[in-house]
Amino acid sequence: MTVNLGMPTPPIPTLAPRRKTHQIKVGDVLVGGDAPISVQSMTTTKTHDVGATLQQIAALTAAGCDIVRVACPTDKDAEVLPIIAKRSQIPVIADIHFQPKYVFQAIEAGCGAVRVNPGNIRKFDDQIESICQAATEHGTSIRIGVNAGSLDKRLLDKYGAPTAEAMVESALWEASLFEQYGFRDFKISVKHHDPVVMIRAYEQLAAKCDYPLHLGVTEAGPAFQGTIKSAVAFGHLLAEGIGDTIRVSLSADPVEEVKVGIKILESLNLRPRGLEIVSCPSCGRCQVDVLTLANDVTDALEGIDAPLRVAVMGCVVNGLGEGREADLGVAAGNGKGKIFKHGEVIRTVPEGEIVQFLVQEANRMADEMDTTGAVEVTVS
């Protein structure tokens, strides 16, 4: 029963429309325009260790990564790019610093894109025309990757620090060099370790060009700190419609970068939701170890890809109500758990059987969603 309190119904919050951007291709992945926002990561292996690099790319792909970047600091790394690009399941971006010759090798190797840093590639500007020709011939896109830690000295002298304005000027100057040869297949990033400066830089850049933007907070830090910085910065910009591809930079396993990136997009309804675990923060009313139970449920359901929301609640006081919007859940207490679907209790099980029963029901619901797109609630 719905009680009318005489209060106006607030509108459902929505994000700003996506910024209209020029669309490019990174391998077979569309970036910009009306393409979905892609999630990127970067390998941590020595690229010339082909086996280790491809193994990590496979793990990233399995986690949902759309595009992967590999470092190319040496001749040995450049020489194996054809193998990496050919065997990778997802498009490869070669990350080039200091040596323009590696740009050409990466293009010829079949990389989906090449990242260049205008702050540190010596004698780069006078080779732009040749790079444009090679990139056009091979269908390779470019990422102009400006980084606060390697900004051109001239801009540091002008602005006194790697400000948002300095990074934007660097990016637009580099873009103009490509534009003079009619080349527009590039995306831009202006990364800073401070989310506030980073946000300001992307907002300024978005107002001055229509190129797709790659979002990133550089040197974000360990997993906990980096996740917060990236979520704050990306959430702000994506809510404004700014951003076409993202990379969460963490001092952690790159697979964690992908997981965080996907969850950020899912949280903003910018990517179809997969499995979601919601759980209460625990309090003095709890009669079960919510932290352990939530972690056990999360681990047990890890292989399920269906868009299920599963709630783990620590008591029956608010558990059923708070978990009503979940597809499946449990409100635990007094050594047992009330299992519910869409707010309706379907079974009460002993505490020791909660995880097993949730896994069983979640798998059944996932199977039904695969075949019918809907699930049936059965009470027993």
From Swiss-Prot:
Q: Enumerate the InterPro entries for this protein.
A: Dihydropteroate_synth-like_sf, IspG_bac, IspG_bac-typ, NO2/SO3_Rdtase_4Fe4S_sf
Keyword Kinase present in the record's keywords: the answer is: no
Question: Which keywords belong to this entry?
Answer: 4Fe-4S, Iron, Iron-sulfur, Isoprene biosynthesis, Metal-binding, Oxidoreductase
| Alphabetical list of Pfam families matching this protein | GcpE
Which cofactor is essential here?
[4Fe-4S] cluster
Q: In which pathway does it act?
A: Isoprenoid biosynthesis; isopentenyl diphosphate biosynthesis via DXP pathway; isopentenyl diphosphate from 1-deoxy-D-xylulose 5-phosphate: step 5/6
Family, according to the entry, reads as follows:
Belongs to the IspG family.
Question: What is this protein's gene name?
Answer: ispG
Asked if Metal-binding is a keyword of the record, the answer is: yes
* Gene source species: Cutibacterium acnes (strain DSM 16379 / KPA171202) (Propionibacterium acnes)
Q: Record's Gene3D superfamilies? A: Dihydropteroate synthase-like (3.20.20.20), Sulfite Reductase Hemoprotein, domain 1 (3.30.413.10)
What is the designated name of this protein? 4-hydroxy-3-methylbut-2-en-1-yl diphosphate synthase (flavodoxin)
User: What are its GO biological-process terms?
Assistant: isopentenyl diphosphate biosynthetic process, methylerythritol 4-phosphate pathway; terpenoid biosynthetic process
Q: Which reaction does it catalyse?
A: (2E)-4-hydroxy-3-methylbut-2-enyl diphosphate + oxidized [flavodoxin] + H2O + 2 H(+) = 2-C-methyl-D-erythritol 2,4-cyclic diphosphate + reduced [flavodoxin]
What EC numbers are recorded for this enzyme? 1.17.7.3
Q: Name one GO molecular function term.
A: iron ion binding
Residues binding [4Fe-4S] cluster are: C280, C283, C315, E322
